A protein has these predicted regions:
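N-terminal Rossmann-like NAD(P) cofactor-binding subdomain of oxidoreductases
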Residues: 2-138
């Protein structure tokens, strides 16, 4: 079995939380794992909003906190509270992909800030400003 793809989520609002939930409930989760979340909100709020969702109900697994980590079924997810992509050391996190869910970054120069900070690949959860701002649309 190959190593799971290590994913970080940047922006943990509605879209970031739905992405984590969908991945957690998917049979693909043995191939894809969230190892980091970057979100300015307080860690306690992140845990609470993960556990209780007004649309989707309770999270289907145990949600807890340990230090600066969110634990989902005992699996640790590192949490940072940076407000700019270059403030996160993506390379040190050992991630393979950042899923950009904040909606704040939509132009090529803005997105290249992630790459310059050590992010090997970036997937947007929202449309880029133009086709010229991204390498591919999936």
């Amino acid at each position: 079995m190959t190593k799971p793809l290590r994913i970080a989520i940047n922006g943990y609002g509605r879209i970031g939380r739905c992405f984590l939930r969908a991945l957690h409930e998917s049979p693909c989760r043995e191939h894809l794992t969230v190892v980091a979340i970057n979100e300015p909100a307080a860690l306690e709020s992140i845990a609470y909003l993960t556990q209780f969702d007004s649309t989707h109900g309770r999270f289907p697994s145990t949600v807890a906190l340990q230090g600066q980590q969110l634990l989902i079924d005992g699996q640790a997810i590192a949490v940072s509270h940076e407000t700019t992509p270059e403030a996160v050391n993506w390379k040190a996190l050992g991630i393979d992909l950042v899923v950009e869910c904040s909606g704040h970054y939509s132009t090529r120069p803005e997105l290249e800030r992630f790459i310059a900070a050590g992010c090997p690949r970036l997937l947007l959860s929202h449309p880029a400003n133009s086709a010229a701002d991204v390498d591919a649309t999936i």
